Amino acid sequence: MEQGAEDIPVVYLHDIKRQYTQGEATLTILNGAKLALWAGQSVALVAPSGSGKSTLLHIAGLLEHPDEGEVYVSGAATTALTDAERTQIRRTDIGFVYQSHRLLPEFTALENVMMPQMIRGLKRSETVSRAKEILAYLGLADRITHRPSELSGGEQQRVAIARAVANAPRVLFADEPTGNLDPHTADHVFKALTQLVKATQVAMLIATHNMELAGRMDRRVSIEDGVIVELE
């Protein structure tokens, strides 16, 4: 990417192609997709089921390799990196939030949020302080000793958000994070996400079917015939 440092997006997808084989047929999901994600900007990915939303997020988040094309993270190409190198980038630069919270049931909210930092080898005192700070920011200061089964759906998802940003990532990917929530709770969780984007200047790409929530994002994009298109 021949740009000045100030012009480099946090994540840039360049000519991404991804195909799957079903029996004797080849299904092209992404076909030359391009997308730039900038610091402090929220982007909604709105597209029908089966259009490639999750595939795009997995490729952008280095969970899956494209068949062709390149994924740049802070200007550095990643597709030729080893699995260990890609894992390290995911741990330091990338956060994920899913439709299902995926919290560890045997651990408290605090311990779940501490986990990504502990994996990186940070001191326990540092991880406790950071986890408490994030949970308090998300309105969960009085719930830190509760296990997932003792939390409401909205609280569980806010803990998942806290865990995703525990390592201060550069980019946050969210795949239908409010899909299992009622409208009121979904609104609360969505506000928490967008507030974090502005407060931390993280880039965010969120796949959602909720057009009302998507309308509050800085940008809206879709997938048509395997390519990314900007929406009004």
Swiss-Prot record:
Keyword terms: ATP-binding, Cell inner membrane, Cell membrane, Membrane, Nucleotide-binding, Translocase, Transport
EC supergroup of this enzyme: translocase
Compartments in which it is found: Cell inner membrane
Location of the ABC transporter domain: 11-231
Pfam families per the UniProt record, alphabetical: ABC_tran
tRNA processing is among the record's keywords: no
Any one GO MF annotation of this record: ATP hydrolysis activity
Membrane-topology annotation of the record: Peripheral membrane protein
EC number of the protein: 7.6.2.-
Listed InterPro entries: AAA+_ATPase, ABC_transporter-like_ATP-bd, ABC_transporter-like_CS, ABC_transpr_LolD-like, MacB-like_ATP-bd, P-loop_NTPase
CDD domains: ABC_MJ0796_LolCDE_FtsE
A GO cellular component entry from the record: plasma membrane
Biological processes, Gene Ontology terms: lipoprotein localization to outer membrane; protein localization to outer membrane
UniProt-annotated binding residues for ATP: A47, P48, S49, G50, S51, G52, K53, S54
Organism domain of life: Bacteria
Function: Part of the ABC transporter complex LolCDE involved in the translocation of mature outer membrane-directed lipoproteins, from the inner membrane to the periplasmic chaperone, LolA. Responsible for the formation of the LolA-lipoprotein complex in an ATP-dependent manner.
Subunit (UniProt): The complex is composed of two ATP-binding proteins (LolD) and two transmembrane proteins (LolC and LolE).
Family: Belongs to the ABC transporter superfamily. Lipoprotein translocase (TC 3.A.1.125) family.
Name of the protein this chain belongs to: Lipoprotein-releasing system ATP-binding protein LolD
Top-level taxonomy: Bacteria, Pseudomonadati, Pseudomonadota, Alphaproteobacteria, Hyphomicrobiales
